[in-house]
């Protein structure tokens, strides 16, 4: 009985999988190494833990957070029209034939051939995507030139459905406004994902047996 329950739990866990991701890892800041506390010097100012008094609170260190304003809109279209029409006609002859073969089949030495090819094809495709929203990400690395590598994930569970929003990329601190917000169009190497996991998303995917027959069918 225990073995049956264990197998059932393993199968249930396999049915609820997290969609794979291509964003920069890790999804949050790495744990910082622990340093020994510096000895106090008896003064209010401590050089080991000081930050400028009039410094703004924009993200610039590992572990800081930045709010990303997602305003993605892409439109693409393509159209093609191909037409091919080709014809060919040939005729060969040796004139009057002599001998018995020529008397029996007087036109046997005259040959003609013709061919005609016609092809017409049209294709048109259009794609329009809009993705808007806000999400806060974490600085996971600071590059030598000061740019920030950010990454973050948001999970929302509604009933049996789970939605995953993931963002990562490189942010120039000069593009971050006074409210610590940056537009997604200002993120370099941006990787923005919106995926879901659950019964609804599974119903939109063709089953493995149907995919197998679709691949082996010659027509």
UniProtKB/Swiss-Prot annotation:
Protein name listed in UniProt: Flagellar L-ring protein
Gene from which this protein is expressed: flgH
Cell compartments where the protein resides: Cell outer membrane; Bacterial flagellum basal body
Subunit description: The basal body constitutes a major portion of the flagellar organelle and consists of four rings (L,P,S, and M) mounted on a central rod.
UniProt membrane topology term: Lipid-anchor
Similarity annotation: Belongs to the FlgH family.
S-diacylglycerol cysteine-type lipidated residues: 15
Its job: Assembles around the rod to form the L-ring and probably protects the motor/basal body from shearing forces during rotation.
Domain of life: Bacteria
Gene Ontology molecular functions: cytoskeletal motor activity
GO biological process: bacterial-type flagellum-dependent cell motility
Lineage: Bacteria, Pseudomonadati, Pseudomonadota, Betaproteobacteria, Rhodocyclales
Signal sequence bounds: 1-14
Keywords per UniProt: Bacterial flagellum, Cell outer membrane, Lipoprotein, Membrane, Palmitate, Signal
């Amino acid at each position: 009985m225990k073995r049956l329950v264990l197998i059932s739990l393993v199968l249930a866990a396999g049915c609820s999988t997290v969609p794979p991701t291509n964003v920069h890892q890790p999804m949050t800041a790495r744990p910082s190494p622990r340093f020994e506390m510096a000895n106090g010097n008896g003064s209010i100012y401590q050089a080991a833990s000081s930050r400028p008094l009039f410094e703004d609170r924009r993200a610039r260190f590992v572990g800081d957070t930045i709010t990303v304003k997602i305003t993605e809109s892409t439109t693409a279209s393509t159209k093609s029209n191909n037409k091919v029409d080709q014809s060919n006609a040939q005729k060969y002859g040796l004139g009057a034939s002599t001998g018995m073969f020529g008397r029996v089949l007087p036109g046997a030495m005259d040959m003609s051939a013709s061919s005609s090819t016609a092809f017409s094809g049209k294709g048109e495709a259009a794609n329009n995507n809009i993705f808007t929203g806000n999400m806060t990400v974490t600085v996971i690395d600071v590059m030598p030139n000061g740019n920030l590598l950010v990454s973050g994930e948001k999970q929302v569970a509604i009933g049996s459905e789970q939605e995953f929003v993931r963002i990562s990329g490189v942010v120039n601190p000069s593009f971050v406004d006074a409210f610590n917000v940056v537009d997604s169009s200002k993120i370099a190497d941006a990787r923005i994902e919106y995926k879901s996991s659950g019964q609804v998303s599974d119903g939109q995917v063709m089953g493995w047996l149907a995919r197998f027959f679709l691949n082996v069918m010659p027509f």
